[in-house]
Amino acid sequence: KRQQQYLDSLKTTWLEYQKRYQLTLDDFAAVCFHLPYPKLALKGLKKIMDKNLPQEKKDLLQKHFDQSILYSQKVGNIYTGSLFLGLLSLLENTDSLKAGDKIALYSYGSGAVAEFFSGELVEGYEAYLDKDRLNKLNQRTALSVADYEKVFFEEVDLDETNSAQFAGYENQDFALVEIVDHQRRYSKVEK
């Protein structure tokens, strides 16, 4: 039932978007979706795919879709952020987008709240991307459930000011370095 709500909301918002802005899929270089899981978003892409689009355009939209789901396949569902993780995945894993290209975006939330909107790539956007992120994701170390639970349930000893210092995270890019008044503070690890 939830899958059908997702797809019905996509169809409704896409039709309304087309009506308001007089745009079709041919106007977009890519479509990014809220990704509870990639197969549902793929069904969505197929649901809105215009049968009259040239095969070359259909292939490009499919290629960009495949690039947009790479991070979600590694990370899993991050709920609200999944659309933007998909956008980041697309931008960092393609070489066929350029400034001026339009990207359609479909946001969906529980309760059948949905929105269809678009963005346009600006000059210089590539400077903000990490083209090696997929490689970094592939280099992660799997934790056993026991090791994960050990870290997750670890008690933090707070001092009398509700603060704590941390060490031992020197091999990571970012680390929890302290807690001050119940606020976690993270920092980029200088290597």
Regions found by a protein language model. Give the residues of each.
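Terminal domain-initiation and capping elements
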Residues: 1-191
